[in-house]
């Protein structure tokens, strides 16, 4: 009986991280907030907001290095495939538009994420990890890359 109780306790404790993860992923509006990401020497902050239609948008609002070293001026979105957006400052780029919550999978997706370094858009899905970070997986033609956004309090 003692072994059974120990095994049951171990199983219950093993399930705790999964339940904590699914709790954060179980409500669509949990994604709303501010996040930061560091990739190599690049660092930026993003704010996720809710659109009037119930979808979500992620927009850069801060960059570690907003100045283009070649020009000495604010860095612009020069690789954007939409030529009308190439004069937009990089610290104002909308990375994700119309992100939808998919309750059956407890993820956000059915949207594109924009990569300003490459000037491409990719399919994106997002979910919270056990440690609270937001995991965003972008895929183009089956090739994927994952970035992590850490929640910030300001």
What is the predicted role of each segment?
Residues 131-133, 139-154:
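Edge beta-strand at a domain terminus
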Residues 7-15:
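Bacterial N-terminal signal peptides
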Residues 32, 37-38, 43-117, 121-123, ...:
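Central antiparallel beta-sheet cores of small beta-barrel/beta-sandwich binding domains
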Residues 1-4:
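Positively charged n-region of N-terminal signal peptides that target proteins for export
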Residues 81-87, 134-141:
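Short aromatic-glycine motifs in intrinsically disordered, low-complexity regions
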């Amino acid at each position: 009986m003692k072994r059974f109780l120990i095994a049951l306790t171990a199983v219950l404790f093993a399930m705790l991280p999964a339940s904590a993860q699914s709790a954060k992923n179980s409500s669509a509006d949990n994604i709303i907030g501010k996040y930061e990401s560091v990739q190599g020497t690049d660092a930026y902050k993003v704010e996720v907001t809710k659109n009037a239609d119930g979808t979500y948008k992620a927009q850069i609002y801060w960059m570690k290095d907003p100045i283009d070293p070649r020009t000495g001026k604010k860095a612009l979105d020069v690789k954007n495939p939409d030529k009308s957006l190439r004069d937009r400052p990089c610290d104002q780029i909308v990375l994700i538009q119309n992100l939808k919550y998919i309750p059956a999978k407890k993820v956000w997706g059915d949207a594109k994420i924009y990569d300003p370094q490459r000037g491409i858009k990719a399919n994106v899905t997002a979910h919270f990890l056990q440690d609270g970070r937001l995991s965003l997986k972008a895929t183009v033609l089956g090739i994927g890359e994952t970035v992590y956004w850490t929640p910030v309090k300001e």
